[in-house]
């Protein structure tokens, strides 16, 4: 019998979520555990780059006037909180994620829902809300590449990774969560992911599978 949720590694892509400078230790929007997962995220990126598999970095970018900010954070930003603000260093991808130095986000392109290429088969997409698929070109991009399997890693499982995984599941993607390369993961979250067919693997297990 076919396992409909088993990863198809030859048709897989890696998705990093919101791993931007402001989320790292000591920064204005610090998310506990995000700096600690960077080495394992780097290992995943190395595996996907070495095999030519697609990589998509999903980011948040807030305008300083708060015009594109979620309602739950709008007042915070309008009062001067510096959270992944357009034009700020904190908005940039964490340096450990970059394929080479001196890459800066093209905020104009991204905010207009364009796709920024930063390497071979490696792009950045802006998402305006929690989910990576909501009002973004992600699904169309993955469809053109005939991707069936998505590997998720990155910042703050309860919010954006979790939402993005549910969105991927409802679009019938096979989903893998690199459970030691995502911050904020908790025991009940693991149970809930398995309950919807998500495969939980370590970064080293994913890397080995991609390289086979």
Protein language model regions, located:
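A short glycine-rich beta-strand->turn/loop micro-motif centered on a GG-aromatic cluster
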Residues: 149-158, 172-187
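A charged, well-structured terminal subsegment
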Residues: 200-212
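Short glycine-enriched, charge-decorated loop/helix-capping segments at active-site entrances
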Residues: 27-34
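Short amphipathic alpha-helices and their capping/turn segments at secondary-structure boundaries
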Residues: 1-13, 42-50
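Active-site-proximal loop->helix
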Residues: 184-199
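Active-site alpha/beta core segments
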Residues: 39-145
């Amino acid at each position: 019998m076919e396992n409909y949720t088993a990863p198809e590694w030859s048709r897989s892509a890696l998705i990093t979520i919101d791993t931007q400078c402001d989320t790292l230790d000591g920064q204005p929007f610090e998310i506990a555990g995000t700096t600690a997962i960077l080495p394992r995220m780097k290992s995943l990126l190395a595996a996907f780059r070495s095999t030519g598999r697609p990589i998509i970095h999903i980011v948040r970018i807030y305008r300083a006037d708060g015009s594109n900010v979620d309602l739950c954070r709008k007042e915070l930003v309008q009062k001067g909180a510096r959270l992944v603000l357009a034009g700020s260093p904190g908005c940039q991808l964490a340096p450990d994620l970059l394929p080479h130095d001196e890459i800066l986000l093209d905020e104009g392109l991204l905010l207009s829902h364009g796709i920024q290429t930063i390497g071979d088969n490696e792009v950045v997409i802006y998402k305006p809300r929690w989910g990576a698929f909501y009002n973004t070109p992600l699904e169309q991009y993955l469809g053109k590449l005939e991707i069936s399997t998505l590997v998720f890693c990155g910042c703050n499982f309860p919010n954006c990774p979790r939402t993005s995984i549910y969105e991927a599941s409802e679009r019938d993607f096979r989903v893998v969560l690199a459970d030691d390369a995502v911050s904020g993961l908790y025991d009940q979250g693991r149970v809930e992911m398995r309950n919807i067919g998500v495969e939980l693997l370590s970064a080293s297990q994913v890397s080995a599978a991609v390289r086979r």
